[in-house]
Curated annotation (Swiss-Prot):
Cross-referenced InterPro entries: TPR-like_helical_dom_sf, TPR_rpt, TTC19
Chief place of localization: mitochondrion
GO cellular component: mitochondrial inner membrane
Species per Swiss-Prot/TrEMBL record: Danio rerio
Entry keyword set: Cell cycle, Cell division, Electron transport, Membrane, Mitochondrion, Mitochondrion inner membrane, Repeat, Respiratory chain, TPR repeat, Transit peptide, Transport
First and last residues of the transit peptide: 1-67
Protein name: Tetratricopeptide repeat protein 19, mitochondrial
């Protein structure tokens, strides 16, 4: 339980990509769509709803959900909220464009049709009808090409790529992400644009899933190097030329990249590098989102897990205890995962009684939450705990007999 399987962890990458379906690269140039609408889709409002694309993803990842791959039918309240905002954004655009005219031009009719197809695709994804979503998106991308509209093409390719990844069609997802990036670059988007780096991170995650380690490592390195260089450049810019949101967006994307690489390194038993990246990601998340933010707590727990695997049980306990305490105070939605990780670390440290108590508490919470995968992991942890207890008792008996 102390360390989720790599498949379980990488499932979160898939889940995040599904969530990213709402987010086309914001900085794609050449918006001839007469729809500021495409770009308005990437600007949800509200507290945390976003200082950046990463904020939402860092909040929802609860990177044990790194754990459970949720299909679109398992939508959360925030998914529904995002969809409502998305629909309202399109509705406002359509009204402003077409509400004052009785007759529409051919171009406006095509725009209407494209908007409707994308709305249908998004709704189909949300309710889990992935085949239907795929059909709508293929029709939408053909229409976008017919209109020679780069923004619409990029947005639709991005949705198609995310959908392909959710469906496990990794080769197809790779091609679609590359196609979207190609259109962005040909339109003049700079290579250090956050949207391009975000797609590069998704590609690196695909390569990691496919065990294409050289490509994965190159991709992760490109993301972190590009973002760090960009942040260095931003330090020299006058304050008025860069908004707090842009600065935060870049920094949180770096945190997300470091976290993704840390999980990749941990899965390959490269724990020193994983600890380094987790510490840096945790620092960013604490500074940008606060000590009690759900993502901060998950990163504390993840770092503790890797420290535990390195044999640094005492340091691991410091981090995981803090995560559990803050999570309890904040009402963390996946407190059972934090408790399970702490139970595993205590078990490895030989504190069997306390470990058993936490495992049972975590198991009860997991049942309440209906987290079947966590329940399975926790039950495996309890079995391991029983085995360790029995082994210790047998060893004690043998020692007594020798005396």
């Amino acid at each position: 339980m102390a360390l989720r399987s790599y498949c379980r962890q990488l499932a979160a990458q898939v889940f995040r990509l599904k969530l990213c379906g709402n987010e086309c690269p914001r900085n794609a140039p050449g918006c001839s769509f007469s729809l500021a609408g495409i770009k308005s889709l990437h600007e949800p409002t509200g507290v945390l709803a976003r200082s950046s694309r990463c904020v939402k993803r860092w909040h929802r990842r609860s990177w044990h959900r790194c754990a459970s791959l949720q299909m679109p039918s398992q939508k959360s309240h925030s998914d529904t909220t995002d969809f409502s905002r998305w629909t309202l954004a399109w509705g406002a655009v359509a009204f402003s464009l077409f509400g004052g005219s009785d007759e529409k031009t051919e171009e406006q009719k095509l725009e209407d049709e494209l908007i409707l197809l994308l709305k249908k695709a998004k709704y189909s994804m949300m309710i889990g009808e992935l085949d239907a979503a795929d059909g709508f998106l293929h029709r939408a991308v053909r229409l976008a090409h017919q209109m020679h509209n780069n923004d619409a093409i990029i947005y639709t390719y991005s949705l198609m790529a995310n959908l392909a990844f959710v469906r496990g069609q990794l080769d197809n997802a790779e091609k679609l992400f590359k196609a979207a990036m190609s259109f962005m670059l040909s339109g003049g988007t700079p290579q250090d644009d956050n949207a391009l780096i975000e797609m590069s991170l998704k590609l690196a995650s695909i390569y990691a899933t496919q065990n294409k380690n050289e490509l994965a490592e190159h991709g992760f390195q490109f993301c972190t190097d590009s973002l760090e260089a960009k942040m260095d450049k931003q330090k020299d810019l006058p304050p008025e030329s860069l908004s707090d949101e842009e600065r935060k967006d870049t920094r949180l994307l770096l945190g997300l990249s470091l976290d993704a690489r840390a999980r990749y390194l941990a899965a390959n038993h490269r724990f020193i590098g994983a600890c380094r990246d987790y510490r840096h990601a945790l620092q960013i998340c604490q500074e940008e989102q606060g000590e009690s933010h759900p993502q901060t707590l998950v990163l504390m727990s993840d770092l503790a897990t890797v420290l535990d695997l390195r044999g640094k049980h005492d340091e691991a306990l410091v981090y995981v205890k803090k995560a559990v305490e803050l999570g309890q105070a904040a009402g963390h939605p996946e407190q059972h995962v934090l408790l399970g990780n702490m139970a595993g670390i205590l078990m490895h440290n030989g504190e069997f009684e306390e470990s058993a108590k936490l495992y049972q508490e975590a198991l009860a919470l997991a049942h309440t939450a209906g987290d079947a995968e966590a329940i399975e992991q926790l039950q495996e942890g309890l079995k391991e705990l029983d085995n360790r207890r029995n082994a210790k008792d047998n060893s004690k008996v043998e020692d007594e007999l020798k005396e």
